[in-house]
A protein has these predicted regions:
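Short amphipathic helix-loop junctions that connect adjacent transmembrane helices
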Residues: 36-62, 291-311
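C-terminal ends and interior cores of transmembrane alpha-helices
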Residues: 100-117, 355-374
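Conserved MFS/SLC helix-loop-helix module at the cytosolic interface between two early adjacent transmembrane helices
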Residues: 78-101, 107
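Intracellular loop-helix junctions on the cytosolic face of multi-pass helical membrane proteins
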Residues: 1-22, 147-148, 154, 175-316, ...
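Central cavity-lining transmembrane alpha-helices of secondary-active solute carriers
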Residues: 65-86, 316-331
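Hydrophobic core of transmembrane alpha-helices in multi-pass small-molecule transporters
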Residues: 116-133, 373-395
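Intracellular juxtamembrane helix-capping segments at the cytosolic ends
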Residues: 132-147, 393-408
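A gly/Pro-rich, aromatic-decorated transmembrane alpha-helix motif that marks the paired
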Residues: 36, 79-83, 165-181, 365, ...
Length: 481
């Protein structure tokens, strides 16, 4: 019987995928369990244990500051982890060994719920560990595919994100109840157990992974080529201004020293960074649903169909909506739009996601205005905002994870994912600094209550308009092999 050509064979799902998705679900349970109770725990345990109304707003600002600072470190470290994985040790070793450090950080956290300094140390260890593996995990998903099954990659990234939010749903439903009934020690201890489970699941799949070896520090790497091009650009600018002379373009000169493939890779990175430059402000707003929105929920009527939820549980609606919307978007909305003749490109998805983020925060701002006026509005308005924000996350976050992998050269896969995650870090440090200013009566102290949310809406709206101008000028090129 003649062999069936590769292009006619049915694409097969890599056998390693279940282990990666199982590991991610358990690890995300651990991470989001900590985040679920952190804002209210910090206020009640450290910043306003006497429940003094006079210092409540300052206590909430300090809680928000520390919460966003934690996320800043958690998403800054992927840059380090990505470089170490790509250049030195490979993704598998980095994920495995840093996961063990992650579990140790969880142990420190559960034993230090009455000591802010030690508790903060545990948070730093967890942030370093979570960040160290973050870029490697999503890039490791892409490594499992080649040209024979690359059409399945988009769906697997959807299921990968599904696993993240499955862990998030379970943790944000269960951990607040455990925190209320049994105290913070157990509430922070259970995530440690799940982190140990995540490490075990990942180790069990060790013989099934496609392990892309590290490339080493090559002479033709991104930094060296970029610095060389920058030096030539200054030289050419000097000649142009003072001598009105320019024989060649910058990249033509760079091509005399470096290979076309290396230069193409560097240019690809800059194309991606032009898109990722707009993600920090998205995350500056998005991450507030796990801190500012949680504290806002303490001032809402939390009755839903006769049952009163805990403030920390309302954030569960975000991953629930995500789990529902991922297949709706992937298998329903996107194909339907394509049938109308409109191509659903990654850049268009991201733009639509930024717009939906603005809409969700407008609802939150109006809700806060009612609270500022002395009202106790229904939580259903916040749930609507969570629904819209979930749609925005599907369009921005999942798309950017895939975009970081498919649009970057082989030697930059983990590092490009890390640069995207760095945007989350930058967004959170900005929000943390705003809250630090509020807590210390600084410049942003005037932006409290509803004006706080309107401030962020205004900033994102400006970035959204700029994105529309930039995105339509960017070419796209896939590097999947």
């Amino acid at each position: 019987m003649p062999e069936i050509p590769n292009e006619q064979k049915k694409a097969k799902m890599p056998k390693s995928v279940p282990f990666i998705i199982g590991n991610e679900a358990a690890e995300r349970f651990s991470f989001y369990a900590i985040r679920a109770i952190m804002p209210t725990f910090l206020v009640a345990q450290f910043f306003n244990p006497a429940h003094n109304p006079a210092i409540q707003s300052t206590a909430e600002a300090r809680s928000n500051e520390l919460s966003h600072l934690f996320v800043f470190f958690a998403y800054f470290m992927p840059l380090v982890g990505g470089i170490v994985a790509d250049w030195f040790f490979g993704k598998y070793k980095v994920i495995l060994y840093v996961s063990i450090l992650y579990a140790i950080g969880n142990l420190v956290l559960s034993l230090s719920t009455h000591d802010l300094s030690l508790f903060s140390t545990g948070l730093i260890v967890i942030a370093i560990a979570a960040g160290g593996i973050k870029s490697c995990v999503s890039a490791n998903v892409g490594d499992q595919f080649d040209k024979s099954n690359q059409e399945l990659m988009s769906k697997v990234y959807g299921w990968f994100y599904f696993s993240i939010n499955s862990g998030s749903v379970l943790s944000t439903l269960l951990i607040p109840i455990i925190y209320k009934k049994y105290g913070p020690e157990l509430a922070f201890g259970i995530p440690g157990i799940l982190m140990c489970l995540a490490t075990l699941i990942f180790w069990l799949g060790r013989h099934r992974y496609v392990k892309v070896p590290p490339t080493g520090v090559k002479k033709e790497n991104f930094m060296r080529i970029s610095l060389y091009a920058l030096k030539k650009a200054f030289l050419y600018a000097w000649k142009k201004v003072f001598f009105n002379r320019q024989d060649k373009t910058v990249w033509e000169t760079v091509a005399e020293k470096y290979s076309p493939e290396a230069i193409d890779g560097v240019q690809a990175v800059y194309r991606i960074l032009a898109v990722f430059a707009f993600t920090p402000i998205f995350w500056a707003l998005w991450d507030q649903n796990l801190s500012e929105w949680v504290l806002q929920a303490t001032k809402l009527d939390l009755h839903i169909f006769g049952y009163e939820f805990l403030p920390e549980q309302i954030q569960t609606f975000n991953p629930l909506f995500l789990i529902s919307l991922i297949p709706v978007f992937t298998y329903g909305l996107f194909p339907l739009i394509e049938k109308t003749g409109i191509k659903v490109t990654p850049l268009r998805k991201i733009g639509a996601g930024l717009f939906l983020t603005i809409l969700s925060f407008i609802i939150i701002a109006f809700l806060q205005e009612k609270i500022d006026q002395g009202g106790r509005p229904t939580v259903w308005w916040q749930i609507l905002a969570y629904f819209i924000l979930a749609g925005a996350e599907v369009l921005v976050s999942i798309t950017c994870l895939e975009y970081a992998y498919t649009q970057s050269p082989k030697s930059m896969k983990s590092t490009m994912t890390a640069l995207y995650l760095l945007g989350i870090s930058l967004g959170n440090i900005f929000t943390s600094l705003v809250n630090n200013s509020i807590a210390n009566n600084g410049f942003f102290a005037r932006y409290t209550g509803a004006s706080y949310f309107w401030l962020f809406i205004s900033i994102l709206s400006g970035f959204f308009l700029l994105y529309l101008l930039v995105a339509k000028r960017l070419p796209e090129k896939s590097y999947v092999e």
